Amino acid sequence: MHATETSLPLVSIIMPAFNGEPYIGAAIRSVLAQSYARWELLILDDGSADRTAEIAEAFEKSDPRIRLFRNPKNLGAAQTRNRGFALAQGEWIALLDCDDIWHTDKLEKQLALASRGDILYCSYALIDESGKHLSDFLVPESTDYEAMLRESVLSCSTVLLRRSILAGQRFPTEYYHEDYVFWLELLKAGYRAIACTEVLADYRLVKGSRSSDKRNAAKNRWLIYR
């Protein structure tokens, strides 16, 4: 696919970035390698103390689809993603953490299911800090509110959201596992979640960071919401 095919829906990719110097380059390159080329990448640096913003800026200069924004202070992942929602122009919104990687056909294969759902997700691989494959997390073809209470299968770097469902919906900032609460809110509102069950993303487990808790994020914390 080519970026000139303007009849295709635009995908806004929101990438929060905080001290991601070792990994952000690989994350951005995985977006550039997508077979589906009609996207914009919004990188939001959240007060990094390393070269994260510098690396992102170099990519911004090389491709007009990439834009870098700097938070005036450290806001945290939830508020940073919410800022990205406000900046996004696409019909679909994707999320990609700066230490994760997409497979080249991720957007194309998920968007092939766009007519069936409002939330599109996929299976993913777990990798370590060096990129070594650890295991696969295979997801069911669909999920709903009750199913998500039993098992969390939606993960930020796998999800595409129809922009129209986000009116008034934002990541809550009062919970530690705000992403899980956010998915529950969308599903409880009746939005349809459909999966491409193929492994289309790599989730990197980084020691000492919240990313090491990705796969089981708040699986049993639904009580705070229910």
Task: Label the predicted regions.
Residues 9-12, 30, 40, 181:
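Cell-envelope/extracellular polymer assembly enzymes that use nucleotide-activated donors
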Residues 11-23, 27, 34, 44:
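A conserved hydrophobic helix/loop-capping motif in glycosyltransferases and polysaccharide synthases
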Residues 22-25, 50-58, 101, 105:
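Acidic helix N-cap motif at the loop->helix transition within catalytic regions
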Residues 30, 37, 45-54, 73, ...:
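A conserved acidic beta->alpha catalytic loop
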Residues 71-88:
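Glycine-rich, basic loop-to-helix element that forms the pyrophosphate-binding segment
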Residues 86, 138-216:
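Conserved nucleotide-sugar donor-binding catalytic segment
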Residues 93:
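Short aromatic/hydrophobic "clamp" motif used to bind/position activated sugar donors
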Residues 105-134:
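Conserved donor NDP-sugar-binding/catalytic core segment of glycosyltransferases
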